[in-house]
Amino acid sequence: MINPEIFFDQLHEREFDFFVGVPDSLLKNLCACITSKSHQNNHIIAANEGNAIGIAAGIHLSTQTIPVVYMQNSGLGNCVNPLASLTHPDIYNIPMLMIIGWSQL
């Protein structure tokens, strides 16, 4: 298991400073770390995964930074359309780092 504090610090060193996502029980330690260590204005808990992608896209367009999006694997279906339309290289080409908790069913 990755230590969430070390992982967060590594992200921060690489200028990944904005976080948005839907909390996941598998990522609960990382979510707690993000909540405690990031600036209040740099962390948004989204209502659903598609919203998280949209918020991340808006952050990139307004700041030119690369946001971090976190979610559970069951939420991937909710973000297919925003991902396909906003991150596609021939459309808006918006980068984002995605962290997806993977439950083994």
List each language-model region with its residue ranges:
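Thiamine diphosphate
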Residues: 1-105
